[in-house]
Amino acid sequence: RGGGISPVVIENMNCKSLPEAPLWDGKMRGILDKYKENNTPQLIIILGQEAWASYISQEYKPDIPVLCGMISKNAILLPDSDLNVAEWEPKYIDIQEYVDKGLHLGGFLYSYDVKENIRLIHNLYPKTQNIALITDNTYGGLAMQTLVKKEMENIKDLNLILLDGRKNNIYTIVEQIKNLPDQTVILIGTWRVDVNDGYYVGNATYTMMTANPRIPTFTLASVGIGHWAIGGFSPKYRPIGSDLAKE
């Protein structure tokens, strides 16, 4: 539609839940190794958190411009193959670091504003003492958890409770929600995959909501808006295919 004539080759990494993460580095390396010398592309387009993490985790990155989409400004590098991801405490990485190092990068990033969400919570519920963060057993869930933990290091008098899908299924999460202490606010990150690699759709948040409907709930990523979450500062998600093509 944009008048381009260059051929496009599509590769799919088939990434699913977080326990597979140690394998993604090798998958990406295998894809990159297919396109060398006379087969070298003019541009690499990376879509999705898992593919992006696999690319930046490469020891050697080809000197080819990269466009990215459907990824977060915050990231974490992939773990070693012998690591138990349920106990993994990754380091927060800002994508700007790679731009500063000379990576030819463009595209569209999602930015999650933890501080603004905490400020909103405090404005509406000034007696809040605990933030219960819900994240799932995916790369995106853990990257979001890592970001929240980093941002809350500088926030005094506020305790972070992790409702972590790496260690729980929806039933154990529901029990934890039932037993949350007073003066707690729930902050929803994401919930698609649980500890058993069970996949969930929107009805999961309805189940969580009924566990303790008296607890105020906010959202980082628009999950729960319209039925559970009061509100929150979230990225503006939208189709980006045509915009990437124009880039």
Positions of PLM-derived features:
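Short hydrophobic alpha-helices and adjacent helix-cap/hinge residues
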Residues: 1-247
